[in-house]
Amino acid sequence: MLPKEDKVNSNHFKGVNDAHKTSLYKRLSSSVIPPLTFLNQNPASPNNEEVPGNNEANKDEKTFSDDEDIAHPIGSVGSSNNFLSFLYAGMGKLSDLKGNDASNANEAKDSKLNDNLRSSRNEQANEPEYRREYKLDYDIDESEEDDIESTRDENTLKPKTEDTSVHSKLDPEERLENVVNMLFDDHDESTTALASDPSKGTVFQQSVLKNFDPFRIQQTELLKLKDITLSTEEDESEEQKLKKKFFRLKVADKLKRVFELNDDDYFYGNYNVWLVRDVLLQGHIYLTKESILFFTFLPKRHNTISASKGTTGGFQHHDDSHDVIQSGSLGMKTALYGDTVFSTPLTHRFWVILRNETITVYHSPTDLYFPITLIDLKSCVRAEVIEKGRNDNASPRPDLHRNDSQEVSSGDEEVEFSNMLNSNYQLEDNSENVSGGYWFKVVTKKKTHKFHSDSLYSARQWVNNIVKVVFQLHNSNANNEVIMKIPINDVLSFDLNEVFGASEKNSDSNGGEEKPKVLNVKYLENGSKGRYALSASRMKKELKNKTKKKMKKNSGNEPDELLSENTYFLLFKDGDEVFSTLNEIVNENHHSSNIFRNRHNSISKKYTSEKGSNWNRPFTHKDEEIHIPRAISTLTTDHFQNSIIDQIEEASHRNTHTQNTDLASPRSECGLTHSVSTSPQSKIRKFGKTLITPSKIFSNKSRTESEKSTPDRSQTTSPVQGINLSLSGLKDLNMAFEASQKNYEVSCTRYSHTEENSTNSPSNFQNNTLSKADALSPQIKSPQPLEAGPLNLTDPSEYEDNKKKNSTLSSIGKSIKAMSSIRSKLAAVNHYEQLDENDTYFIRDVSAREVDTRHFQERFSFNNKKQLIASYHCHIIRAVPVFGKVYLGDSEICFRSMLPGVSTRMILPLIDVDTCSKEKGSNIAYSGLVLVIRGYDELFMEFSVQSARDDCLAMILRQLEKNRESGNESSDDNKSAQHGKSGCFQKTPSSAETTKSSNEIKLAQWRIENARLKLFEDKINAAAGLHVPIVLEDSPFYKTEIRPSTSFNFTLLTIGSRGDVQPYIALGKGLLNEGHNVTIATHSDFEEWIVGHGIKFKTIAGNPVELMSLMVTHGSMSLSFLKEASSKFRGWIQELLDTSWKACQGSDILIESPSAMVGAHIAEALGIPYIRAFTMPWTRTRAYPHAFIVPDKKKGGSYNYITHLMFETVLWKGISSQVNKWRRESLGLPRTNLYRLAQYDIPFLYNISPTIFPPSVDFPDWVKVTGYWFLDEGAADDFEPSKELVEFMNKARADDKKVVYIGFGSIVVEDAKSLTKAIVEAVLNADVRCILNKGWSDRNSSPAKDNAEPEVELPEEIYNSGSIPHDWLFPKIDAAVHHGGSGTTGATMRAGIPTIIKPFFGDQFFYSSRIEDIGAGIGLKKLNARSLCTALKTATSDAKMITKAKKISERLKQENGVLNAIEAIYYELEYARSLILAKQHENTKHDLKSGTQTPVVNETNEYFDSDTYDADHDSDKESDHDQTYEQDNHSDYDVANDDNMTEIVEPSLEDGNDTVRIAPDSGNDNTTVTDANK
């Protein structure tokens, strides 16, 4: 709440009245920055805001401190028109560019028809409408987004007006007619006749009917077919044959128009290929008599997913996860801290999100409205990992580099693996030190941004994803398709090479399997002026730049080499057929080739004879007098296009078996030659050797300057050394492509319902000509005609070295000049959308509106679909008031600072704004406006003029109402797809809804597919040292994905209670659905439960009841806990080690709860990847304390970090001697210590919601917060409540009383009856109804004692229900009181009810603190009648807390914890494997397999490992007598031995009033602290 007017200091009025008498500086400062004295009065300040849960229940110190704690524990304290748009993207003739009335009329007619068809389909489907991606004059068919399995029915083929029942009764003739109607809505009689008699068609149509096969696919060693039946013509019915004919005719018509093919052209065939550029792109190649055609459907953006339609006025919070490609913590040097000016070894961590068009940098993952940096990827040139050899100032790890030689020596391997270990272990606080890790850079037109990643795997992942996004933005048209046409007359030469040879050891393994081939087509770049050809000025500039570069590399090149380009196509199948067909085409076109060669030679002569700029002029009309096909391409031609080829060029050279055809050879009559040679032209084939001779893990080859100058790709000969290799290298990766066939009818819909003449309009022609990056970029209409190039981008070389146009001084001068006129602008209100004729704020100058809109789009990295509504000048209240400009867009409220040196920016989606209202300003001179944001603090703005504030309020409310009315029917462009937690308005789902929508499941599955693809890329890189970003096609015929060729054997190892095992069952079921084998190894008590879910079971030692009793008794980490654990569980630990080792035999991947303590050692012995997963903080961080050492009051980041070090040290001291003995005797491994275990580097999965446990920015890349792993056992559906319970709840509702749940599980307390009495009294005083689950008991309880003392009688306001399924009960009540376990806390949050937590032990203290911090509940430090009564009243009546709990529930229901965990497993699998390989290499290097010796390692006390700790370890002292471990006497805390136990001494602790649960003795509430100086 803002301060009242009467609280404003009178000095403020005086300051305002005397403003005109002050100097210019005072007038300026008073207008820019309001007086700051209000900061101490404004309760809305973050420092003064009342913390949720910090209510009377906790503020009354006497209530909780003076009274007895009754509960004191014992001893404790798709789109249908995508391909169609591609087909007719270029069908209009150049003469039609100006447009005409007929074409515009046809466009309007077809647009209306398409709208009717689309609305008809939406009404038929009766399903939620998918969001549409940004599109330019094309539409998306919702049916494509449906699950593949759901589309395998005949309903897709039914006419628009028929339902399923009617369609199923149609006779064959009617069904044929429906097929015709579906494919040809205009009932083209000529096409129907042509389908019946193909001889009536043109040559091209007849050839397509004969040779086009849309489902052409064959199984290979690297491509597996799933559920695909390849039928022959004999097996097809007449209906199927007719459908194929109509479909092929439709394709022929579109191919002819989009590629400008002649009727006399002949279609030879279509083939599946991979285009090799900076990505490996899956696609198709068409061969005709006159051209080589390539096209592909790029993957659709996944922000097409939306929630279901809701009722008017409601809403549903839906974040922008559909638009997020990757997110995580990265280091970055920013000007904010002087990092870009001063070279330091430090960096600062930020939260970075990669989206479809931007990279956005935030301070933390919880503050996504105020970005620090926005990088527009539409202006991005390239992204790459920085190698130390290329940039010595980047400070990457010096130890991770590739040797100059290709062969790997054992000595180099030893140094590399050893250094990799040591570098990883040097990090103590990862938030600042960047001596390890890797840098990568993102180069844009204006600036180069550098980011620091913790591992090379993470850096590669970021770079690969950025490269894929940039490729799609720069190399596709607005319809998300890649198109290329190479006229045969422009082809200079082509050759076919084998990618892999036949190695000696595998020469017979493949039998008759066809080997992959690469087709290299060399053609004259921009040789023909086509639809996508460059303009004269751009062609001249690009040819000049590229020729200069090539001349520097190879001064002896011929002119045709300088003007040529190479395109590489990888064919896993049909390589020989493609080559022979291309030979046949060339032979048939030899006459055209001669004509072309004459023209080409004339160009060469001009180049060699002329000086100046005329030599590279574009072709003139005189050149066009000869009829030749026109070149078409959406691909860029920059010099970074073939980075994969460049990588392969760096590999060692060898001879290859090459088929080569050089069209420019003078040895034949028509300039053609067909030969079989040993040319090394195939750079792709060099990929083979790297697979058979892998480079070192993480290696990056250091090259000398001479090596860096790679040979020109146009050269055809060079001396090489050959090594033959079969496919076994790729097979050993155990990954393969899997293709599943889509429904034929769904494929047909991609070619139907067309807008025949839509591309004839000038606007559509321009949009289809531009790349997606330019099509989505902010633009202003210009009277000059735009160049016809596909990108309209400057050549990268022209802006790479550009310096800033304005110096720092000039920019400051401009800022001061702007500020001098700021008072005249304070009252400026601008409307860019006219409200009515009397709108005085509306800017009527069209050009001015366009300029302002473009600036708005550019400053916030929006695309050109975002519209500006209004703008204002105001102050936004943050830590200090910041003056700037507010922009109201159609879907966002944005702000940018106008103060020099202040870079505050805000992008707030309107979808997250509940409402806004007027408030009084900080003083009389200002008028306030407050924005109420869901799940966020209120945002305050202050205006110097009241009329501006009132207009801003009215416009925001108007836009909110407009968005609510539009609801889900608004296009995706009106939703916030770029920033923040955006979504769509609809009715809030009730808290009882716990199921996830199918769209969210699809999104999670899509992310898993990308994770598998990333795993495959990692495997290729580890095996070959090549960075190969792979882009899979979104084909209408097949769905291609990467899958492991064999099932992995997962072992999930955990100990503890039922709550510890349940998440692993949920994860195991998810892995089973992925096709893997899963075994859970845990206590025998849970065997029946686990096997019942279809998961294999293996038993390990331990009694969960005893473990729980120990934890409850001691509450948290303490000296008494360590003593009792050592005395009682030493024998159990040995059994745990032995049984766990036995249970993990045969595993491929081990996932372990770190409480089991054995996973790292077993994985090292088995040589398998190892991943940790847990429900509480276990990673070193400054954000959260260790779950077992939670202080009563927050002590800051340094304390939090040291708690993790303390716990790691204490736990290792307790088990180190037994573990080391077990390693030597059972595992055959050497002794280890905490330093070499490097637990910090192990991949970690937190099965906690990121809403409750937001990932910290100092988490390393391999730590993932996935969300809760909920196990849906159907208990809510199967549970039958008793009649008494139903009546009790109905009566409470009838009496208008709140219903709460109270249950603490089976805890043991000092006095159970007193606890029951306190609960009864609290419930009665709070006037609520209680469902009680009484499971607690006395420490000294016995049957005789229980009979002697009567049980507490429960009043009618309390119903003792016993155990009830949480997922059934919690959605039906108003609040819950429990002990704070991870599972119970997640259940209450998912149900959306406020939670009261009374922690007893372990992580319960952490969750109590977190629930209170996020404002969704209350944490009770002491439980008694008074405190519980106050908490119950607050939880059932605090509207803010209730609303917060509901909002958290909405977010939790959108999470897919299990699927997110599977995605993370795939992402981190190769990194986890590399850690184990490094450890094994270290053991091998020191010959430590027998465990007889251990290398000397200097380590500090926190890692010190002493064998004297174990009295039973005398036999080991002799073998280790010669080994010495140095101790550092300057540690932060000391370790003292007392009865073989460890006491932690922390000198930084203050007085005993600050209770710290770290070493209290049983029954003592005060912390025992030893003076560190003694």
UniProtKB/Swiss-Prot annotation:
Stretches with biased composition (Acidic residues): 139-148
Its EC number(s): 2.4.1.-, 2.4.1.173
Domain PH: 323-471
Residue span of region Disordered: 37-61, 102-170, 389-413, 538-559, 651-722, 774-806, 964-996, 1505-1574
CDD domains from the UniProt entry: GT1_Gtf-like, PH-GRAM2_AGT26
Ranges of biased composition (kind: Basic and acidic residues): 107-121, 128-138, 149-170, 702-711, 964-976, 1510-1533
Reactions it catalyzes: a sterol + UDP-alpha-D-glucose = a sterol 3-beta-D-glucoside + UDP + H(+); ergosterol + UDP-alpha-D-glucose = ergosteryl 3-beta-D-glucoside + UDP + H(+)
Subcellular location: Cytoplasm; Membrane
Compositional bias ranges of the Polar residues kind: 37-48, 692-701, 712-722, 985-996, 1563-1574
PROSITE patterns, A to Z: PH_DOMAIN (PS50003)
GRAM domain span: 253-288, 854-920
Residues of the signal peptide: none
SMART domains: GRAM, PH
Chain sites annotated for binding UDP-alpha-D-glucose: S1057, R1058, D1060, N1333, I1364, H1366, H1379, S1382, G1383, T1384, D1403, Q1404
Gene Ontology terms, MF aspect: sterol 3-beta-glucosyltransferase activity
Function: Sterol glycosyltransferase responsible for the glycosylation of ergosterol to form ergosterol-glucoside.
PANTHER family: STEROL 3-BETA-GLUCOSYLTRANSFERASE (PTHR48050:SF25)
Protein name stated in the entry: Sterol 3-beta-glucosyltransferase
Origin species: Debaryomyces hansenii (strain ATCC 36239 / CBS 767 / BCRC 21394 / JCM 1990 / NBRC 0083 / IGC 2968)
